[in-house]
Amino acid sequence: MQNNNDILKAQSPAALAEEYIVKSIWQDVFPAGSNLPSERDLADKIGVTRTTLREVLQRLARDGWLTIQHGKPTKVNNIWDAAGPNIIETLIALDMQSAPLIIDNMLSLRSKMSESYIYEAVKNSPQKSTALFAELEQLQNTAQDYTEFDYQLFRQFTVVANKPFYRLIFNSLKGVYQRIGLLFFKEKTHRELTKQFYLEMQQICLEGNADAVVDCIRKHNLRSSTYWKAILERLPQNLSD
């Protein structure tokens, strides 16, 4: 776990404390399994109040970075065992070298999940599935609009399919989903390719042809895979800013 950028960028005291602790954990200054320094020592070192530090520690504990032990020192967790997908955006900020792999994993997960729950959605309620494309004709040809439409479309299919767990996964990935979506959809060719996918999927929903869902998704993923490969090979260093 390494990061060449040791300069803290946070502005507020709480953000500064969080960035310092998270970077220190990632760089093994505070290794997994070790204990953090006392609140007093850590607050003095960072330059924040103990109240601010305590709030930050509680938030990091909820995210899986730490385990707060009442009456005992706060323990540093192994994030790969204790954290959830909501920290992905933080991991990308900490280690841009690992970002392509993490994002590729996320895209693969989305593809596999969507094959399952979109099939269920179209099978159980083709009318509600079709309604998700109501705004497609008015979709503006911009990266921002395509990114938002894409996120909402895939997320709302989880609602129609009655898959609340998948919906929570989308919620936790929203930040990084939007960042990489803007990278993908800034190219007109990518928007045109995706628009064709939307139209094909809309027709499938209109016909209630659930059996065609998986093939449609896989064909789109295959068509777009070359574009994604190029994007992941030249990710901007300021992706997390």
Curated annotation (Swiss-Prot):
Species assigned in the record: Haemophilus influenzae (strain PittEE)
Keyword Hydrolase in annotation: no
Keywords for this protein: Activator, Cytoplasm, DNA-binding, Fatty acid metabolism, Lipid metabolism, Repressor, Transcription, Transcription regulation
SMART domains, sorted: HTH_GNTR
UniProt-listed SUPFAM superfamilies: GntR ligand-binding domain-like, Winged helix' DNA-binding domain
Assembly and binders: Homodimer.
GO BP annotations, alphabetical order: fatty acid metabolic process; regulation of fatty acid metabolic process
UniProt xrefs under Gene3D superfamilies: GntR ligand-binding domain-like (1.20.120.530), Winged helix-like DNA-binding domain superfamily/Winged helix DNA-binding domain (1.10.10.10)
CDD domains the record matches: WHTH_GntR
HAMAP family recorded: HTH_FadR
Cell compartments where the protein resides: Cytoplasm
InterPro entries named among the record's database cross-references: FA-response_TF_FadR, FadR_C, TF_FadR/GntR_C, Tscrpt_reg_HTH_GntR, WH-like_DNA-bd_sf, WH_DNA-bd_sf
GO molecular function: DNA binding; DNA-binding transcription factor activity; fatty-acyl-CoA binding
GO cellular component, one term: cytoplasm
KW Protein biosynthesis (keyword) present: no
Reported function: Multifunctional regulator of fatty acid metabolism.
Domain HTH gntR-type: 11-79
DNA-binding region: 39-58
Classification via PANTHER family: FATTY ACID METABOLISM REGULATOR PROTEIN, TRANSCRIPTIONAL REGULATOR, GNTR FAMILY
Entry protein name: Fatty acid metabolism regulator protein
Disulfide bonds: none
